[in-house]
């Protein structure tokens, strides 16, 4: 059937709840090469082809209702001049375009999926027989293009990042491809990214039936299991999922692989066919256990029957059945054309519905991608319903489009927060105009406390010890005296502990400081300084509540009740040493205290 039709294409991808985004999509529309464009040996070099005028020199410049991306590229094919005589055959024949759609779901890294996105279409159209009118030759060329892309990945394996264990990259990807040329649709796929076709059997009935064009390449299929086991591979069930086993030497093995080498069998991949996955190469058979050869099929499009073509990754088909997906797209199109609602595109709607079902089941959403192609007979007022998220194509007008030039990643509402791009300022606080306080080594005290201590140290000590009858200055002098004592301890490099005190204790400390003589102050300094032969064991410092620590500044606090003297200080020092010996009696000596682990303490309140 040589009917005219137009395509409304929408594409959308979402990272879901996964840490990495490994789904990629590709849309390429370009003029189909014809036999007249190829240089003929009979043509003389003195008769070059007429130059193609630039788009700026074209008359008019008006765009059609097929979207800005298509209209800008349609201008590349000039219209024949009204005053000039038409060419014999080239101007009378309108060139058509070929459309290429692909969804690739990567695993083990994004490298294989990205490589397939950039080179798969180029390998397919270079194969001999792809431009043939015979479907069998076209399908053979598509299969050769898949294999050529797979072998090209082998050459790039050294450039791909290695695994965490230092092994070569295990990156691979599924690939579902739809090629539309004229009234023929060619489908090729490897993996579990499916293609669904919506068919309306009765024009009087609004029901559109979903037909699965592809079958997922799962290891549990009898055909795939037989092929895998015939190549020396195996399939193993892990957590309810059948996976292709990766037979690799043990990581501790060095040198060539022999019969005595221990081989680990790891259930690895949940698909039986994919591009990449170079770890599955079998040296005995010379083939890949995870096959890169696709399944191909040919379909003749009828705009009156075929309404939708949906390409999706497993993140979409695991949540939305094919029939539900077709019905959702049909409802979305009815809202757009009948009710005039310009909402989200069909692809975005399907992806959002799938993510919602992932959340309803309380599961971490997988990478989800979808390409929806709406087929309709050629309509004159197609431009009235143009949506910025959709691309409208008429392949007979020879349009050109490449999604790599306009690829924009959309953040997912349920994905891990992405890493900031390099264009943003990596050091916002450093480059900001706000004042940032300098780093000060406060020695376990706040900055304000050190300023107060330094200010008091510069003052005269006599102003601190003079008693006052007024209660408010008395409290201020007491606080300064306590701060001065702490500052003195800091100069002696001794750790101290602050305890809450009331006004009575503060007054007693003020009196003690006033009554102290130079000899008594020297005795207090001797008490604060630990003796040279005193060794603090690790058990004492880390024992926690098992033993009570000695209060070092207790003498100055109790000096009001009993005058301090040098003999009393020596007696107390001897008693402290005796108490420490009794507490450490029976404990095991430690060779190196730094290697000793901390004790676990339990506080019972």
Swiss-Prot record:
Segments forming domain PPM-type phosphatase: 8-375
Skewed-composition ranges (Basic residues): 579-588
Phosphoserine found at: 40, 85
Any one Gene Ontology molecular-function term assigned to this protein's record: protein serine/threonine phosphatase activity
Tissues with expression: Expressed in fetal and adult brain. Also detected in fetal liver and skeletal muscle, but not in their adult counterparts.
Coiled-coil intervals, chain numbering: none
Cell membrane found in the keyword field: no
Binding site for Mn(2+) 2: 105, 314, 366
E.C. designation(s): 3.1.3.16
Induction: By p53/TP53.
Reaction it catalyzes: O-phospho-L-seryl-[protein] + H2O = L-seryl-[protein] + phosphate; O-phospho-L-threonyl-[protein] + H2O = L-threonyl-[protein] + phosphate
Pfam families registered for this protein in UniProt: PP2C
UniProt region (Disordered), positions on chain: 28-90, 516-591
Cofactor(s) the record lists: Mg(2+); Mn(2+)
Cofactor details (free text): Binds 2 magnesium or manganese ions per subunit.
Any one of the GO CC terms: nucleolus
GO biological process, one term: regulation of transcription initiation by RNA polymerase II
Self-association state and partner proteins as the record states: Interacts with CHEK1 and CHEK2; dephosphorylates them. Interacts with MAPK14.
Stated family: Belongs to the PP2C family.
Known function: Involved in the negative regulation of p53 expression. Required for the relief of p53-dependent checkpoint mediated cell cycle arrest. Binds to and dephosphorylates 'Ser-15' of TP53 and 'Ser-345' of CHEK1 which contributes to the functional inactivation of these proteins. Mediates MAPK14 dephosphorylation and inactivation. Is also an important regulator of global heterochromatin silencing and critical in maintaining genome integrity.
Disease as annotated in the protein's UniProt record: Jansen-de Vries syndrome: An autosomal dominant neurodevelopmental disorder characterized by mild to severe intellectual disability, psychomotor developmental delay, speech delay, and behavioral manifestations including attention deficit-hyperactivity disorder, autism and anxiety disorders. Most patients have variable additional features, including feeding and gastrointestinal difficulties, high pain threshold, hypersensitivity to sound, hypotonia, broad-based gait, and dysmorphic features, including mild facial abnormalities, strabismus, and small hands and feet.
Name this polypeptide is given: Protein phosphatase 1D
Organism: Homo sapiens (Human)
């Amino acid at each position: 059937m040589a009917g005219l039709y137009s395509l409304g294409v929408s594409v959308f991808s979402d990272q879901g709840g996964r840490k990495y985004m490994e789904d990629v999509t590709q849309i390429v529309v370009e003029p189909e090469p014809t036999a007249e464009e190829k240089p003929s040996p009979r043509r003389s070099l003195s008769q070059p082809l007429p130059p193609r005028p630039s788009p700026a020199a074209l008359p008019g410049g008006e765009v059609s209702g097929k979207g800005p991306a298509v209209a800008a590229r349609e201008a590349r094919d000039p219209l024949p001049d009204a005053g000039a005589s038409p060419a014999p055959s080239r101007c009378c024949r309108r060139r058509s375009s070929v459309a290429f759609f692909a969804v690739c779901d990567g695993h083990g890294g994004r490298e294989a999926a990205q490589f397939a996105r950039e080179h798969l279409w180029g390998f397919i159209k270079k194969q001999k027989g792809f431009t043939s009118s015979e479907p069998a030759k076209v399908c053979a060329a598509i299969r050769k293009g898949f294999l050529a892309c797979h072998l090209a990945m082998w050459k790039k394996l050294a450039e791909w990042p290695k695994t965490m264990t230092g092994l070569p990259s295990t990156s691979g990807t599924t690939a579902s491809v739809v090629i539309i040329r004229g009234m023929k649709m060619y489908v090729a796929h490897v993996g579990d990214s499916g293609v669904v076709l919506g068919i309306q059997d009765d024009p009087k009935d609004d029901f559109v039936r979903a037909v699965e064009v592809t079958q997922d390449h799962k290891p549990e299929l009898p055909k795939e299991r037989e092929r895998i086991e015939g190549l020396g591979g195996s399939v193993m069930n892990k957590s309810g999922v059948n996976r292709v086993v990766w037979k690799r030497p043990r990581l501790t093995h060095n040198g060539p692989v022999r019969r005595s080498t221990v081989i680990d069998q790891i259930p690895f991949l949940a698909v039986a066919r994919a591009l990449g996955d170079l770890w599955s190469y079998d040296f005995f058979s010379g083939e890949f256990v995870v096959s890169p050869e696709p399944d191909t099929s040919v379909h003749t499009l009828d705009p009156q029957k075929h309404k939708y073509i949906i390409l999706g990754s497993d993140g979409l088909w695991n949540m939305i059945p094919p029939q539900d997906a077709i019905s959702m797209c049909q409802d979305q199109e009815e809202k757009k054309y009948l009710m005039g609602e310009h909402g989200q595109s069909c692809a975005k709607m399907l992806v959002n519905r799938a993510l919602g079902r992932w959340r309803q089941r309380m599961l971490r959403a997988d990478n989800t991608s979808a390409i929806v192609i709406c087929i309709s007979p050629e309509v004159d007022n197609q431009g009235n319903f143009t949506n910025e998220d959709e691309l409208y194509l008429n392949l007979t007008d020879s349009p050109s489009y490449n999604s790599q030039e306009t690829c924009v990643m959309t953040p997912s509402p349920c994905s891990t927060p992405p890493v900031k791009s390099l264009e943003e300022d990596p050091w916002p606080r450093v480059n900001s105009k706000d004042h940032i306080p300098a780093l000060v080594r406060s020695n376990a005290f706040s900055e304000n406390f050190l300023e107060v201590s330094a200010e008091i140290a510069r003052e005269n000590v006599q102003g601190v010890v003079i008693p006052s009858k007024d209660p408010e200055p008395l409290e201020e002098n007491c606080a300064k005296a306590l701060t001065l004592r702490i500052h003195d301890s800091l100069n002696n490099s001794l750790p101290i502990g602050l305890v809450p005190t009331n006004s009575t204790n503060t007054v007693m400390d003020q009196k003690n400081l006033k009554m102290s003589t130079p000899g008594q102050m020297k005795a207090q300094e001797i008490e604060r300084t630990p003796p040279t032969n005193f060794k603090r064991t690790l058990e004492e410092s880390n024992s926690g509540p098992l033993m009570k620590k000695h209060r070092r500044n207790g003498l100055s606090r109790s000096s009001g009740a009993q005058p301090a003297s040098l003999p009393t200080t020596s007696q107390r020092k001897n008693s402290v040493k005796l108490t420490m010996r009794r507490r450490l009696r029976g404990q095991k000596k430690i060779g190196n205290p730094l290697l000793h682990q901390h004790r676990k303490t339990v506080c019972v309140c």
